[in-house]
Amino acid sequence: MNWLTNVVRPKIRNILRRETPENLWIKCPDTGQLVFYKDVEQNQFVIPGSNYHMRMGAVARLRAIFDNETWYDVALPEVVADPLKFRDERKYADRIKDARTKTGAHDAVRVGFGKLETSPVVVAVQDFDFMGGSLGMAAGEAIIRGMELAVEKHAPFIMFAASGGARMQEGILSLMQMPRTTVAVQMLREAKLPYIVVLTNPTTGGVTASYAMLGDIHIAEPGALIGFAGARVIEQTIREKLPDGFQRAEYLKEHGMVDMVVHRHDLRPTLARLCRLLTKSPALTVTTAVEAPAEAAAKAEPEATTTEQPGAPAPTEPPAQPAAPQA
């Protein structure tokens, strides 16, 4: 029996584990329902039936927003990886390496430049899977670079926020990104360019105390947690019970903190419409949508395109002369 229990059974278990991928099924946090991962992925990471919005990676976000799933990865400034040589239970440098291996990203923010229903836009996405989307020096530089590019190209800037706050391992250098990004937002305003923020689950801490709540328009995904301090901290401070749904997207909309709550499937057309309205661009008609590729091929100069794929290299610079929105 010892041979059977100690040798044969573990081997059988290992075979079964190898044949079944870990992410084959996803459990809905709202209903507990098990859903096939591919179905959720094809549904933009929205659980069919319950409509629960799962977290979405940066690459998936950019694919869902840009025309033909095509964009240019914007080259971001290099920063010191571990300026304070911080260590808690583990070295901060080791945590950064693990996060980069897990996500394939350099840091928590990725910036892309491309077309949204034929209009040029700059999109920045915070990836919560990278150390909780925390705001550090690299993330701050990425956001500022994205806003500078929006000014250079005279294009709207769209920010997908998802963060637990400032990155504690970088100390005051992390907190400095709050005023720096706030100054960059002012730069967009002086250039009279739209700044649209999409608040996703969760958006908390120093991010909500800076650029995430300074947009011209604030959109929230259904059920997103949005706030500065956690609900338990607030309850302990004020010694009162908070209302149901406090800090959720719907509650914030009812109390005027966000402009609209938009389902993920409706985000792309909503963002395109807002960009057209704020830049006073003509609406995209069926005729122009059909004729645009032929006209572009006839008179436009050759323009490189990139379809982002996991693991595939992508150009790091935007095109020299993108089509500017019509006045």
From Swiss-Prot:
Q: Where in the cell is it found?
A: Cytoplasm
* Origin superkingdom: Bacteria
Location of the region described as Disordered in the Swiss-Prot/TrEMBL record: 293-327
Q: What is its EC number?
A: 2.1.3.15
What the entry lists under PROSITE patterns is as follows: COA_CT_NTER (PS50980)
Which SUPFAM superfamilies does the entry mention? ClpP/crotonase (SSF52096)
Q: Which key words are in the record? A: ATP-binding, Cytoplasm, Fatty acid biosynthesis, Fatty acid metabolism, Lipid biosynthesis, Lipid metabolism, Nucleotide-binding, Transferase
Please note every region of biased composition (Pro residues). 312-327
Asked if the keyword Cytoplasm belongs to this entry, the reply reads: yes
Q: Which Pfam families does the UniProt record give? A: Carboxyl_trans
Task: Please state which protein family the record places this protein in.
Answer: Belongs to the AccD/PCCB family.
Please describe the quaternary structure of this protein: Acetyl-CoA carboxylase is a heterohexamer composed of biotin carboxyl carrier protein (AccB), biotin carboxylase (AccC) and two subunits each of ACCase subunit alpha (AccA) and ACCase subunit beta (AccD).
Task performed by this protein: Component of the acetyl coenzyme A carboxylase (ACC) complex. Biotin carboxylase (BC) catalyzes the carboxylation of biotin on its carrier protein (BCCP) and then the CO(2) group is transferred by the transcarboxylase to acetyl-CoA to form malonyl-CoA.
Q: What is this protein called?
A: Acetyl-coenzyme A carboxylase carboxyl transferase subunit beta
Q: What is the lineage of its organism?
A: Bacteria, Pseudomonadati, Pseudomonadota, Alphaproteobacteria, Hyphomicrobiales
